[in-house]
Amino acid sequence: MVTYSESGVDIDLEAVTVSKLASKLKSTLEYRDIITDSGHYAALVRLGDKAIAMSTDGVGSKILIAEMMNKYDTVGIDCIAMVVNDILCVGAEPIALVDYLAVEQPDPERAEEIAEGLVTGAKESRISIIGGETASLPGIIKDFDLAGTGIGFVDVDKIITGEDIEAGDVLIGIESNGIHSNGYSLARKALFDDAGFSIDDKMPNCDTTIGEELIRPTELYVKPIVALFKEEYDIHGLAHITGGGFTNLRRLKKGVGYDIYDLPEAPEIFKLIYQQNVPLEEMYKVFNMGIGFVVITNENEAEKIMETLKDYCNCQIIGKVTDDEKITVKTFEGSEVTY
């Protein structure tokens, strides 16, 4: 049985670490009018009748896949996506980003490829990359790491934190295009270390290789979600489904649960990972399993929201909000997992 912790990532220890950091940093919040808790997707700072949304994230160990394939022109898209998709989750439209590239040794050609992806992601998201930092850190960094910090703006009266979520609301799931940028330590262990696949091996039931599926850039959700903002729908919550899978929904509101009973067919890459002795409970806790973003709204508003979304992406109602605080997911095998 292969788990995330066995692949070198201890989610529970990460949570304790983040908690200790946050408890110390909390003392600085008194200097500004902060709206969101530190555990939300993006922080909000009030400026009069508007708020700045800020979020920071990186590409993670997906970079190792880029190195295996000697292909660096898409990891910049991942960097942009991981930041802007989080900013959307508080109702804000992303507007700008700064990047951080840490390298073992400078490599101008690789940096140019990385920049191509950053530009592609920025143009698709309609944001400006206004600066950044490149640091040479031999002895600290192996190869390179890439991260970004983004900002967005939102009117204070249009902020979406999840506080309006209530039992009976419906979950609209927007499809992912694969793994996106989370769970790669588990994927690499299951597929390469344990099963012995290579990046050039063909995917079952697909015309692509395993490497091509793993390097596929993270979906950008700016256009469809901003389209919802402009229509001023009654949106109760927004969730970017990243590391932690559907347990990310707990970041929105305490005291509610979620019954996820109608997911689209899981992409083949997830089925291949599962076949390498990874438990279903672990799969749905680590990966997005085919849903990259969730919109939570009341039942009456759902159809109108989906009509707008379908101009940009594939979506469907995947579940509902409950009042028992559990998250239950019906898996592609027909069984249920509960968190």
UniProtKB/Swiss-Prot annotation:
<dbReference type="Pfam" id="PF00586">
    <property type="entry name" value="AIRS"/>
</dbReference>
<dbReference type="GO" id="GO:0004637">
    <property type="term" value="F:phosphoribosylamine-glycine ligase activity"/>
</dbReference>
<keyword id="KW-0963">Cytoplasm</keyword>
<keyword id="KW-0547">Nucleotide-binding</keyword>
<dbReference type="GO" id="GO:0005829">
    <property type="term" value="C:cytosol"/>
</dbReference>
<keyword id="KW-0658">Purine biosynthesis</keyword>
<dbReference type="Pfam" id="PF02769">
    <property type="entry name" value="AIRS_C"/>
</dbReference>
<dbReference type="InterPro" id="IPR036921">
    <property type="entry name" value="PurM-like_N_sf"/>
</dbReference>
<keyword id="KW-0436">Ligase</keyword>
<dbReference type="GO" id="GO:0005524">
    <property type="term" value="F:ATP binding"/>
</dbReference>
<dbReference type="InterPro" id="IPR036676">
    <property type="entry name" value="PurM-like_C_sf"/>
</dbReference>
<keyword id="KW-0067">ATP-binding</keyword>
<dbReference type="InterPro" id="IPR016188">
    <property type="entry name" value="PurM-like_N"/>
</dbReference>
<dbReference type="InterPro" id="IPR004733">
    <property type="entry name" value="PurM_cligase"/>
</dbReference>
<comment type="similarity">
    <text>Belongs to the AIR synthase family.</text>
</comment>
<protein>
    <recommendedName>
        <fullName>Phosphoribosylformylglycinamidine cyclo-ligase</fullName>
        <ecNumber>6.3.3.1</ecNumber>
    </recommendedName>
</protein>
<comment type="pathway">
    <text>Purine metabolism; IMP biosynthesis via de novo pathway; 5-amino-1-(5-phospho-D-ribosyl)imidazole from N(2)-formyl-N(1)-(5-phospho-D-ribosyl)glycinamide: step 2/2.</text>
</comment>
<dbReference type="GO" id="GO:0046084">
    <property type="term" value="P:adenine biosynthetic process"/>
</dbReference>
<dbReference type="InterPro" id="IPR010918">
    <property type="entry name" value="PurM-like_C_dom"/>
</dbReference>
<dbReference type="GO" id="GO:0004641">
    <property type="term" value="F:phosphoribosylformylglycinamidine cyclo-ligase activity"/>
</dbReference>
<dbReference type="GO" id="GO:0006189">
    <property type="term" value="P:'de novo' IMP biosynthetic process"/>
</dbReference>
